[in-house]
């Protein structure tokens, strides 16, 4: 990892008036030029992290570093960090040009330089020619672009975005996801994005921090978070999941619904209680006798690209299936899946425990070079 641009070291926050602890020992390093997302439900602490980073709130304990320098006591205007707020915080009585140029005027930048940089920045956010427009006459998407232009015109080290897409309609929100991601990659500035929308996080991020009740419960790439959730909360919060109670018989063998199935997971105790995650899109509908499981279709909804089918097995477990095939309510169908489709979770395992287990398991599972060489020599002798 390169030298971090932002570091949180054991940062906690408690509001003194209520005594409520909203952050609990937050630790992370952010690299330069990446798109990070703080993802969590309302009240999870994600916006509090953003406000502490910006200098709008003080941490109760812990240290915050920017480029290796502690900034806990550094005023907002001295931090090379700019924020795009949920309501954009634009000046309604000013034009687009005046809003974007505001920070440069405070710094007493030359007028010609201001005009040049405003024009360049508006072009970046696809608002070229909007300089003299009134803020009040702009659409929601255009106002957001103005807010982003104002945040990046000084070329800050970090841009913070506090749920800036939440007020937009679905189509515009999707368009802005592409635009924000492309803009961040073009500028090479570190973006820290706050959202409760898991689809936004998965679509835009290099790295996601999943938050719950003031703690980071898992961090990783979008693929890691989706394919390898470490606990029930993450599996349930990120995408749709079928989560079934089971038993890890031994490495690569799990039992649930009274049957044993091959898996690709290991490193757990024999006969340890676990939870098994199967994503709805990984379940294939078959004839009942050909399926690994048999379920009875209860209801279904057409979601445009697939049918969302709800079915129940003989034990009463609910199953969600995504299929391009329409099912018949009341019919019994088979469900097929591969070992790779099963993700096994230990009960109440933390991210640190998960990482340590996987590292230890991989080391134990790797054959030594001496054994590999011996096997190869044996095969060569047999071929002679």
UniProtKB/Swiss-Prot annotation:
Pfam families: ABC_tran, TOBE_2. It catalyses: ATP + H2O + polyamine-[polyamine-binding protein]Side 1 = ADP + phosphate + polyamineSide 2 + [polyamine-binding protein]Side 1. ATP binds at residues 40-47. It is found in: Cell membrane. It is a peripheral membrane protein. Its main location: membrane. Its EC number is 7.6.2.11. One of its GO terms (molecular function) is ATP hydrolysis activity. It is an enzyme of class 7 (translocase). Gene3D superfamilies: 2.40.50.100, P-loop containing nucleotide triphosphate hydrolases (3.40.50.300). SUPFAM superfamilies: MOP-like, P-loop containing nucleoside triphosphate hydrolases. Keywords: ATP-binding, Cell membrane, Membrane, Nucleotide-binding, Translocase, Transport. Residues 6-238 form the ABC transporter domain. The keyword Transport applies. NCBIfam families: potA (TIGR01187). Part of the ABC transporter complex PotABCD involved in spermidine/putrescine import. Responsible for energy coupling to the transport system. Belongs to the ABC transporter superfamily. Spermidine/putrescine importer (TC 3.A.1.11.1) family. The complex is composed of two ATP-binding proteins (PotA), two transmembrane proteins (PotB and PotC) and a solute-binding protein (PotD). This is Spermidine/putrescine import ATP-binding protein PotA. It comes from Streptococcus pyogenes serotype M4 (strain MGAS10750). The gene is potA.
């Amino acid at each position: 990892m390169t030298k971090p641009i932002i570091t949180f070291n054991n940062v906690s926050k408690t509001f003194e008036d209520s005594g409520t602890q909203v952050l609990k020992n937050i630790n992370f390093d952010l690299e330069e030029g990446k798109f990070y997302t703080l993802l969590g439900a309302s009240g999870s602490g994600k916006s509090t992290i953003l406000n502490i980073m910006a200098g709008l709130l003080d941490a109760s304990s812990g240290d915050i570093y920017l480029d290796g320098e502690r900034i806990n006591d550094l005023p907002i205007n001295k931090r090379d960090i700019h924020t795009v707020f949920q309501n954009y915080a634009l000046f309604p009585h000013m034009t687009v040009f005046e809003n974007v140029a505001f920070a440069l005027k405070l710094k007493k930048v030359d007028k010609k330089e201001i005009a040049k940089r405003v024009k360049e920045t508006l072009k970046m956010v696809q608002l070229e020619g909007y300089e003299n427009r009134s803020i009040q006459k702009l659409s929601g998407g255009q106002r957001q672009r103005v807010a982003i232009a104002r945040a990046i015109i000084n070329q800050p080290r970090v841009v913070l975005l506090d749920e800036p897409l939440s007020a937009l309609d679905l189509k515009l929100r999707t368009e802005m996801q592409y635009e924000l991601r492309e803009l961040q990659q073009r500028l090479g500035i570190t973006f820290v994005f706050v959202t409760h929308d898991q689809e936004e996080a998965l679509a835009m991020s290099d790295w996601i921090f999943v938050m719950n009740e003031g703690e980071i419960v898992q961090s990783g790439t979008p693929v890691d978070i989706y394919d390898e959730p470490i606990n029930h909360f993450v599996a349930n919060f990120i995408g749709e999941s079928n989560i079934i109670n089971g038993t890890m018989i031994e490495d690569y063998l799990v039992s649930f619904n009274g049957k044993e199935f091959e898996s690709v997971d290991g490193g757990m105790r024999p006969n340890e209680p676990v939870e098994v995650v199967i994503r709805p899109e990984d379940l294939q509908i078959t004839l009942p006798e050909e399926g690994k499981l048999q379920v009875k279709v209860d209801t279904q909804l057409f979601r445009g690209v697939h049918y969302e089918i709800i079915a129940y097995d003989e034990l009463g477990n609910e199953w969600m299936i995504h299929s391009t095939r329409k099912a018949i309510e009341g019919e019994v169908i088979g469900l097929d899946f591969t070992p790779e489709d099963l993700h096994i979770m230990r009960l109440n395992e933390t991210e640190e425990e998960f990482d340590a287990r996987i590292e230890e398991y991989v080391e134990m599972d790797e054959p030594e070079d001496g054994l590999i060489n011996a096997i190869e020599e044996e095969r060569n002798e047999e071929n002679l």
